[in-house]
Amino acid sequence: MTSVQTRLEKINSNKFLLFSLLATGFIMLYVNFLDSETRTLISDLLYVPIPGAMLVLSLVIAIRFGITGKHGKAWILFALLSVSWFTAEQIWMIEELVYKIDPWPSLADFFYLTGYPFLFAFSIFYLLPLRKAISKKLVTIASLISVTILIPTFSLVYQSNSSANDFEIVLASSYPVLDALVLCPALIGISLFFKGEVNFLWTLICGAIVLNVVADTGFLMLTIDDSYYTGHPVDLLFLWAYLLFAFGVYHHIKIFKSHIKDPYENIDELR
């Protein structure tokens, strides 16, 4: 009975995830047919409940596991990431909706950039218990892919003929560097999923990282080209990334609730 109930919960959760992704996609498509003021308002407001859900869930799981072991430390780092990025989103919204100023570059970038070291450290701590399944070849391939993506993006920033000043160029170029940093462990995590070493729920988080990297790259190119606007389709990738993060954390809370002291005591439960 418990097994059947667990399966039903997973099916319902996956349906809710799919519904959330589709609903968010529909809203972002719809706002692009509205006037710019309404589009900006609705798009900015979406960054309250969606990153907010990620924040609340990350605090719940961080409190649940505490600072015990690598897994506990990992979730504390993830909670710090969530706080940092949620703060950044609210600063962006306030500057754009209340103060009517361009939120890029702004204080929001400080909190966006601050989140990346937390995300990288979280990924490392989380993958450490699986280090025996991670080969040097896998690390090398993931690193090469990350660098391969970094170089052209970095190059385009400096070769751009946009009106951005030196500070904006340096600020913009720091995003692809940090994206490459977090992309490497995410690719390792996805590879482990296809090898059967980790479950789909951990892959949600890795997928969220990849989506965020793609969104960052798109946002960067559009901003340098002065063609970005709030509500642009690229924003959907950021929102989807937050949703995947939130659902990944939620499912981890469900899976590991009975393994607080040693969530990797039975490694098969990750598969």
Regions found by a protein language model. Give the residues of each.
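Polytopic alpha-helical membrane-helix bundles and their juxtamembrane interface segments
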Residues: 1-271
